[in-house]
Amino acid sequence: TGLKESIGVITEDAPIGSRTITASLTGVSAGSWVCLVLGTPELGNTNDDVINSELSPYRWQDIKVQQGTTPNIKTNGIQIFEYHQIEKISGNSVTFKEPIMHAINKDWGWNVHKFANYANVGVEDLTFKGHAKEKFIHHGSDIDDGGFKLIDFVRLTNSWMRRVNFESVSEAMSITS
């Protein structure tokens, strides 16, 4: 995931759309990339209020499942990952270049993690020709599902692809954090 250990806890609420959070962070400065994490990189937050806020206007208790079972969203919880570049830090006030996408409730256990990434990676002016199978069978073989997956952008920031053509491929490109 590119996420390092937690470098601080968010200590004040922040509304959706805000560009500033309150947290005492270590080892980062203006220009650094971080990830706001609710839950942990490994485990989800199973608090009813947290889950229901993500499902609003619905509630996890309203999810219809087989009698006697608990929905996965309650059993496994939810994880939220928001990636941001720091614009400035002043004391415990951390301002991002872009607004946050979730309302921050300090009581829910939001943490800040360093985000290991690569920047300014680009692919331009190329044509990729595969040899995808004519008769596709979902999960039929490795060739069916990913044999001609050509580009995988992983943990990239400020990166691009332009004037690139793909012919006879099963998956041209993936972008993951």
Predicted regions and their residues:
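Extended acidic/polar, glycine-enriched regions
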Residues: 75-127, 131-133
